[in-house]
Curated annotation (Swiss-Prot):
Protein name: Histidine ammonia-lyase
Gene label: hutH
Entry annotated with the keyword Cytoplasm: yes
Crosslinked positions (5-imidazolinone (Ala-Gly)): 146-148
GO cellular component annotations of the record: cytoplasm
Pathway: Amino-acid degradation; L-histidine degradation into L-glutamate; N-formimidoyl-L-glutamate from L-histidine: step 1/3
Modification sites for 2,3-didehydroalanine (Ser): 147
Catalytic activity reported: L-histidine = trans-urocanate + NH4(+)
Keywords: Cytoplasm, Histidine metabolism, Lyase
InterPro entries associated with the record: Aromatic_Lyase, Fumarase/histidase_N, HutH, L-Aspartase-like, Phe/His_NH3-lyase_AS
Free-text description of this protein's post-translational modifications in UniProt: Contains an active site 4-methylidene-imidazol-5-one (MIO), which is formed autocatalytically by cyclization and dehydration of residues Ala-Ser-Gly.
Lineage summary: Bacteria, Bacillati, Bacillota, Clostridia, Eubacteriales
Organism: Clostridium tetani (strain Massachusetts / E88)
Length: 514
C-alpha cells in the first residue's frame, strides 16, 4: 500500500488499497482543488434550475412513480428531507465500521466528480464525519441495488440532519449527539441534495470492494495452506513444473504454480513423480488450475471495483455544459454480476481446502494417524473440524447462488428490473469469511500432520517453514483433547489470517503473486 497519511479525492483515481486505508486504518480524506471547483460549478446549475422553476426530475419533481408531480420552489428543501426520512427503512444487522467508512468514502468520491449538484458544504460535512469517526448506523438489508442503495444510504444521511443513530468513539448514540460531540454542525438539505446523497451504488460497491481485497489476500493464504498440505502428504512437485502451465497460459494458473514452487523450495517432504506414487489426487495436483481460476475471477472483479469507485452513479446528472440528464447510472447490474462471480471464486477456494483437509485426517487416504489424533479413541483429534469445514463450504454453495438473476419490480413498475447487487456483495463477503475459517482449519491440520513426521528428518520449504513457525508460535501440537477447546485453537488460526501475520511472515521469505 502507498505510504500516505491522507487520501485526496479527485473522483478519478481512488484505488482499492486507498479505500482499505481509509476504511480500516482510519486515514483522513480531503478534496482536491479540482474537485472543489467541479462541485461548485455543478451547484450553480442546480441553483439556476430552482430559481427559474425548470422541470427537472428529483429537483422540482417528486421521485419514482411521483416523477410527474411538480414541486414548488418553496418546497424543494422539504422534498429532500422528506426523501431521507421516508427512504430510511433498512432492516437487520448493522454494517461493520469498516464497511460504513468505505460507504462514506466512495459516496464522497463520487460526489467530488461534480456531476451531482451538491453544495460544497454538504459534501464537506460528510467528509468531516468520516474524518472525525462519526459512523452512521446502516442496516444491511433493504436495498434492491437500483435505484442504487436508497434505503441504506438514507441511513447514512440521517445523522447529518441530526436524526438516526451513529457510532462515535466506540459508543452508539443518537445521530445528533454524535454530531454534537464531534463538533460537526447539523445541516439542512437544499434542492437535489438528498437525492445526490442516496442515489448511488456505494453500499454494494463498498461491501464488495472490501470482500475483493480480503479475497486477494485469502488466495495467497490458500496457496500457503495447499503447499503445507502437499508437504504433509508428501505430494508430488512435478505437477507444478512451469513447462506444464505455460502451455495453458492462464495467468492465475501460472502464478499459482510459481507460488507453490517458491513456497516448497528446498523441501525434502515433497516427492517426485513415481517416487511414492505416480499421481496425486486432484485437490493436490490441480491446485494451480483451481486456485488459478479463482485468482483470474477476483482480478476481473477488482478491475470492475476500481472503475465503480471512481464513477458517478447519481440520477439525474449535471453536465459541464449545464444540461441535466436522466439516465440509469444508479443501476447496480455492472457490479451485481461481478460480485456474484466473486462469491463463486471464493467458494471454490474453500471447497478445495476442505477436500485437502479430508485427505489430511482420513487415515484411509494417507499414512498418518486417524484424524491426526496421537492417542485415538479416547481422543477424537481433528475429526469434527472436518464437519465444521464441510458445513461452511455447504453454506457457501447456497450463498454462491447468483443474486443478480433475480428481480422484483418496484415503484409501481417504473423500476421494473433491479440488480439485487447489494445482496450479491453481502453474500460474497460472507463466503470470503467462511473460506477464511476453512483455510485456517487446513493450516492447523497440515501443521499437525507435519509434526507426525518430525522424527523423519525432513525439511520444510523456504516459505512453508515460515508459515509453520507462525502457526506454532500461536498453536501447539494437539496431543490430548483434554488440553484444548478446539474452537479456541481454530480462532487463533483464523486470527493469524485476519490480522495478516501469517501472510506477512511468509512474504518476508518469498514474494507471492496474485
Amino acid at each position: 500500500m502507498k505510504n500516505i497519511k491522507e487520501v485526496i479525492l479527485t473522483g478519478n483515481d481512488l484505488t482499492l488499497e486507498e479505500l482499505v486505508l481509509v476504511a480500516r486504518e482510519g486515514y483522513k480524506v480531503a478534496l482536491s482543488e479540482e474537485a472543489k471547483d467541479s462541485v461548485l460549478e455543478s451547484r450553480k446549475i442546480i441553483d439556476d434550475i430552482v430559481e427559474n422553476e425548470k422541470v427537472v426530475y428529483g429537483v422540482t419533481t417528486g421521485f419514482g412513480e411521483f416523477c410527474n408531480v411538480s414541486i414548488s420552489k418553496e418546497d424543494c428543501k422539504t422534498l429532500q428531507e422528506n426523501l431521507i426520512r421516508s427512504h430510511a427503512c433498512g432492516y437487520g444487522p448493522k454494517f461493520s465500521t469498516d464497511i460504513v467508512r468505505a460507504i462514506m468514502l466512495t459516496r464522497a468520491n463520487a460526489l467530488s466528480k461534480g456531476y451531482s449538484g451538491i453544495r460544497i458544504g454538504t459534501l464537506n460535512t460528510l467528509i468531516e464525519m468520516l474524518n472525525a469517526g462519526v459512523h452512521p448506523q446502516i442496516h444491511e438489508k433493504g436495498s434492491l441495488g437500483a435505484s442504487g442503495d436508497l434505503a441504506p444510504l438514507a441511513h447514512m444521511v440521517l445523522p447529518m440532519l441530526g436524526l438516526g443513530e451513529a457510532e462515535y468513539k466506540g459508543e452508539i448514540m443518537s445521530g445528533k449527539e454524535a454530531m454534537d460531540k464531534a463538533g460537526i454542525p447539523i445541516i439542512e438539505l437544499d434542492a437535489k441534495e438528498g437525492l445526490a446523497l442516496i442515489n448511488g451504488t456505494q453500499v454494494l460497491t463498498a461491501t464488495g470492494a472490501l470482500a475483493v481485497y480480503d479475497a486477494i489476500e485469502l488466495l495467497k493464504v490458500g496457496d500457503i495452506a495447499a503447499a503445507l498440505t502437499i508437504e504433509a502428504l508428501r505430494g508430488i512437485k512435478d505437477a507444478f513444473d512451469p513447462r506444464l502451465h505455460v502451455i495453458r497460459a492462464h495467468e492465475g494458473q501460472m502464478a499459482t504454480a510459481r507460488n507453490i514452487l517458491k513456497l516448497i523450495e528446498g523441501s525434502t517432504y515433497v516427492t517426485r513423480q513415481g517416487e511414492l506414487r505416480v499421481q496425486d489426487a486432484y485437490s493436490l495436483r490441480c491446485v494451480p488450475q483451481i486456485h488459478g481460476a479463482s485468482k483470474d475471477t477476483i482480478d476481473f472483479v477488482k478491475e470492475k471495483v476500481e472503475i465503480e469507485i471512481n464513477s458517478v452513479t447519481d440520477n439525474p446528472i449535471v453536465t459541464r455544459e449545464g444540461d441535466v440528464i436522466s439516465g440509469g447510472n444508479f443501476h447496480g447490474e455492472p457490479m451485481a454480476q461481478p460480485f456474484d462471480f466473486l462469491g463463486i471464486g471464493a467458494a471454490e477456494i474453500a471447497n478445495v481446502s476442505e477436500r485437502r483437509l479430508e485427505r489430511l485426517i482420513n487415515h484411509q487416504l494417507n499414512d498418518l494417524p486417524a484424524f491426526l489424533a496421537k492417542h485415538g479413541g479416547l481422543n477424537s483429534g481433528f475429526m469434527i473440524t472436518q464437519y465444521a469445514a464441510a458445513a461452511l463450504v455447504s453454506e457457501n454453495k447456497v450463498l454462491a447462488h447468483p443474486a443478480s438473476v433475480d428481480s422484483i419490480p418496484s415503484s409501481a413498475n417504473q423500476e421494473d428490473l433491479v440488480s439485487m447487487g447489494t445482496i450479491a456483495a453481502r453474500k460474497a463477503r460472507d463466503i470470503v469469511d467462511n473460506a477464511k475459517r476453512v483455510l485456517a482449519t487446513e493450516l492447523m491440520a497440515a501443521c499437525q500432520a507435519i509434526d507426525f513426521r518430525a522424527d523423519k528428518g525432513f525439511e520444510l520449504g523456504k516459505g512453508t517453514k515460515e508459515a509453520y513457525k507462525v502457526i506454532r508460535e500461536a498453536i501447539d501440537f494437539i496431543e490430548y483433547d483434554t488440553d484444548i477447546q478446539m474452537y479456541k485453537e481454530l480462532d487463533k488460526a483464523t486470527e493469524l489470517i485476519t490480522n495478516g501475520k501469517l501472510l506477512e511472515a511468509v512474504e518476508k521469505a518469498v514474494e507471492l503473486e496474485h
